[in-house]
Regions:
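A conserved acidic beta->alpha catalytic loop
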Residues: 1-9
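Short beta-to-alpha linker loops that shape the active-site pocket of alpha/beta-hydrolase fold enzymes
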Residues: 2, 85, 168
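Short, conserved SAM-binding/catalytic segment
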Residues: 14-18
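Acceptor/aglycone-binding surface of glycosyltransferases and processive sugar-polymer synthases
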Residues: 21-45, 50, 62-145, 171-186
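Hydrophobic helical membrane-anchoring modules
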Residues: 140-278
Length: 278
């Protein structure tokens, strides 16, 4: 992760005393996603039963580890992840900018991934079993800040069970996030849009056809029609200052209602199709 706190030398000093401690390192910085992918590949190739991601930034409480592990070890889930938002105190502990960005991305990730029961999509405190390790194509996983979001989409296509686990949000007092919220939200939103379309194609067309793709498609078409028709309404009203043709107003409202209903039904069908993956 391109850390500058002598992490490598510290790990090497301890690995000489403990043969179970294995250090994996990159010659070039590959981002957080690249580091996680390398670790997962090593775990897969060495027949590890459960692989856990715990960052070295002291923001993941080790006391939460048993709770993260239990669902995977007991066979209740293929992938478990921490959720800092379960706590009613989360908004007080998490930096405001990060909390706001996380909330937006969590909503978008629900839609893109099909895991409607999960939240706190940006947490990296996770556990994954050997079945999922062997099925996921780690070479295709996103390598940057959107890695957790991308992985959830890939797991959904593979019908892996995912469980959210309450964890304690750990942040230093007065800590300020270095994340540029506008860049992160737009870049990951674009990633989620692409992965959402990929999931619809892969899961509901190629692997097993589901009519919800028609509902999403019609919702999209009526959405475009809504924009065009309302633009014409505002053109008559604001630019020309004339009366709005009643047929135009009715068509705009019809398109808006149709787009909303088709999209909401598509989401509902998606939720029903994935409810067994909790």
């Amino acid at each position: 992760d391109f850390s500058t706190d002598n992490t490598i030398s510290e790990v090497e000093s301890y690995s000489s005393k403990n043969s179970k401690l294995v250090l994996l390192k990159h010659k070039n910085n590959q981002g957080v996603g690249g580091a996680i992918a390398t670790g997962y590949l090593w775990a897969r190739d060495n027949d590890i039963d459960v692989a856990v991601v715990m960052a070295g930034d002291a923001q993941m409480d080790p006391f939460d580890l048993p709770d993260i592990l239990d669902p995977v070890v007991e066979g209740q889930a293929d992938y478990s992840k921490g959720n800092r938002l379960f706590s009613g105190e989360a908004y007080k502990k998490i930096p405001k900018v990060r909390y706001f960005g996380n909330s937006i991305l969590s909503l978008l990730t629900k839609i893109a991934s099909g895991y409607w029961h999960i939240a706190d999509s940006q947490t990296g405190y996770t556990a994954i079993n050997s079945k999922a390790l062997k099925l996921v194509d780690w070479d295709k996983m996103y390598r940057r800040y959107g890695q957790p979001n991308d992985l959830l989409v890939m797991l959904n296509v593979l019908n892996m069970r995912v469980k959210d686990i309450q964890i304690n949000p750990v942040y230093s007092v007065g800590e300020k996030s270095g994340i540029k919220i506008h860049k992160v939200i737009f870049s990951i939103s674009w990633l989620l849009l692409k992965r959402f379309l990929w999931r619809l194609k892969e899961k509901y067309i190629i692997r097993d056809f589901h009519p919800l793709v028609f509902f999403y498609f019609l919702g999209f078409l009526f959405g475009i029609a809504t924009v065009i028709l309302f633009s014409r309404v505002f053109y008559y009203w604001i630019v020309l200052g004339s009366d709005i043709p009643s047929i135009n107003a009715l068509a705009a409202m019809f398109s808006f209602m149709s787009s909303s209903l088709f999209t909401l039904f598509a989401m509902w069908f998606d939720m029903e199709a994935n409810k067994a993956l909790k």
